[in-house]
Amino acid sequence: LGLRSKRVGYCINVGIQLIKTGYNLRDYCQIAISRLAKISNSLAQRRKMQLVATSCRLGEGSELGPEAVIDNNRTSPKYIDIGANSYCRGRLLLYAHGGQIKIGDYCYIGIRTEIWSMQSIQIGDRVLIAHDVNIHDGTAHSPDAKQRHEHFKNILKRGHPSTWDDVPGVVAEPIVIEDDVWISFGATILRGVRIGQGSIISAGSVVTSDVPPGMVYQNKIEPHLRPIK
């Protein structure tokens, strides 16, 4: 039996003995539930620390929230580097064929935020990224339908590709988010963008070009149709 099963069994046996001696069942159940919750939280924290050790570098005072996901498809934790005193509740993902994510000190990554890299995403210090933000430095798929189909079939057969040769038509460019930037909820940051120091990205904006320092950026994409090249 595992450690958790042994502890649960121990709690049950102790409860039976206490009930036989006239101990109040309701009081014991409350105590047992509290202790089991502590055991569960302890095991969850242990699993989280094991995840950190194998998938990323976590600076002093930094934490991964219970909702955080580290999806490192590369071979080393050095490719996801989180600085000191930062808190991440979102998903950090590296593709197997490339990518790295570097997050500075005193940063916050909100719940359901997705940061996916196949090239490079660098986030400075004191950056606030709200919930439901998407940051992607690559196109993920080819604009050519046949290449997309082959890519999908290869993933099903062999898993995600490990070299750039296996993803024809895919394009990636580095993203840089400088110090003291605030990205509000629901924003999307696309490849090749640099956001200057202290700038604010308004909720729901889609950023496709550089933002100078100290600016408020607001952009809602309007419907626009053009032929596929």
Predicted ranges, named:
Residues 194, 209-210:
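Conserved functional loop/turn residues at catalytic and ligand-binding sites
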Residues 133, 193, 205:
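Short beta-to-alpha loop/turn elements within the nucleotide-binding domains of ABC transporters
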Residues 184, 190, 202, 207-208:
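Short hydrophobic beta-strand segments in globular cytosolic domains
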